[in-house]
């Protein structure tokens, strides 16, 4: 017989409380506590997976064989780079991103390139027919890719037991629910319980699992922060839907570096790997145009060239406007203050607009020199030589 109890869980960080509170004491957010009903079993229950596994036994550390196990080749150079050289067997990987950014497309075209692996694709958002249409659009078909549309965690384990796949894809974790939790799919308790169960399955059976997750309005993975702590690797798929490029960034990686990133170009037939991102980010028609400067920046450990565009004009509507796209507006205001105080350029009564071409968001301070060069170029209406590439941080002194 199961006992029920009511708890309140913060939808932002996963902090639990026996009663509702207005402000979360853990993350400081307001009105984020939601009611959850949790059943506590009075008897020992069987594992949700129902898959027979060996019980763990203590072993001597020096007797453990630590041979490097070969990683699974994903047949995608950018994805392999971000994962740290490939997918580690028995690992749990979470891929997050905005709706429609291309997460399912990235995973689908990757698994279709793996004919040597038996893959089970579990979809909780699309039907089998919709997945077939997506695969046809990608022009790649694998005979060893199995599709199942299911949202029950218990039934997913049944399909895994019957098929014995080499790799499991779950799209998405917010649609999966377990019978042990009396709450709707996507709730804090469901996401946490399902993720913890899937992690135990991956470790016990040595089967890698890829989870696809959504992000909330703050840009973090939807669900409790404990979800990011549960999984082995967290990959963020970023980009603007109005631009054709996408960036795959590693936020957490227990088996590799978090400094790597992969760049893709969105096309009608799927995502194309971009080995030289400078070709994608630089335009070819800016020669002789004022307000344009080329900068050398580093994202992760990959250096590439970006185009910095600026427009300076007289303020017409009273207070001058300051706008920056892809660059920190506060840092731009600091650079404008340095120009006025240290160099003597009077920009207090000018509108200043800054844009990083391609929609890229850059935090590298090495592009400061290119930013002020583009601003001065636009203010003086004098073009910067197209062969000049700039890199340098600007200080207050």
Task: Identify the residue ranges that each predicted region occupies.
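Peripheral, non-AAA+ core regions of ATP-driven protein-machinery
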Residues: 2-12, 16-81, 88-94, 101-111, ...
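P-loop (Walker A) phosphate-binding loop of NTP-binding proteins
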Residues: 98, 124
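Conserved RecA-like ASCE P-loop NTPase motor core of nucleic-acid helicases/translocases
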Residues: 119-123
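Residues in the short beta-alpha loop(s) of Rossmann-like NAD(P)-binding domains
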Residues: 125-127, 215
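Short beta->alpha linker loops
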Residues: 126, 151-152
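Conserved SAM-binding strand-loop segment of SAM-dependent methyltransferases
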Residues: 148
């Amino acid at each position: 017989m199961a006992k029920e109890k009511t708890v309140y869980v913060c939808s932002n960080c996963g902090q639990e409380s026996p009663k509702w509170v207005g402000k979360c004491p853990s993350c400081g957010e307001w009105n984020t506590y939601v009611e959850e009903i949790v059943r506590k079993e009075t008897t020992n229950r069987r594992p949700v997976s129902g898959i027979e596994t060996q019980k763990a036994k203590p072993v001597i550390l020096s007797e453990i064989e630590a041979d490097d196990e070969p990683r699974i080749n994903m047949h995608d150079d950018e994805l392999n780079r971000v994962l740290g050289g490939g997918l580690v067997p028995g690992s749990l990987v979470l891929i997050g991103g905005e709706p429609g950014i291309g997460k399912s497309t990235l995973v689908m075209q990757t698994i279709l390139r793996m004919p040597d692996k038996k893959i089970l694709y579990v979809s909780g958002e699309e039907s089998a027919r919709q997945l077939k249409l997506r695969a046809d659009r990608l022009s790649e078909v694998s005979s060893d890719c199995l599709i199942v549309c299911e949202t029950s965690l218990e039934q997913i384990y049944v399909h895994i037991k019957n098929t014995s796949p080499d790799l499991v894809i779950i799209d998405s974790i917010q649609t999966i629910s377990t019978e042990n939790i009396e709450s709707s799919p996507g709730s804090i308790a469901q996401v946490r319980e399902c993720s913890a169960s899937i992690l135990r399955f991956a470790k016990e059976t040595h089967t890698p699992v890829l989870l696809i997750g959504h992000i909330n309005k703050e840009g973090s993975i939807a669900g409790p922060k404990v979800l990011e702590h549960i999984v082995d690797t967290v990959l963020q798929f970023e980009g603007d839907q109005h631009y054709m490029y996408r960036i795959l960034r590693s936020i957490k990686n227990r088996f590799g570096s978090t400094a790597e990133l992969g760049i893709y170009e969105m096309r009608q037939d799927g995502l194309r790997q971009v080995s030289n991102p400078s070709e994608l980010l630089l335009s070819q028609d800016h020669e002789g145009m004022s307000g344009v400067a080329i900068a050398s920046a580093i994202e992760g450990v990959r250096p590439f060239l970006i185009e910095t565009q600026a427009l300076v004009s007289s303020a017409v509507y009273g207070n001058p406007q300051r706008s920056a796209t892809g660059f920190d507006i506060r840092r731009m205001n600091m650079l404008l203050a340095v120009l006025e105080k240290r160099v003597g350029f009077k920009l207090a009564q000018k509108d200043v607009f800054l844009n990083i071409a391609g929609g890229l968001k850059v935090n590298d301070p090495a592009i400061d020199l290119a930013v002020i060069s583009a601003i001065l170029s636009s203010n003086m209406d004098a073009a910067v030589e197209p062969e000049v590439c700039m890199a340098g941080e600007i200080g207050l002194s």
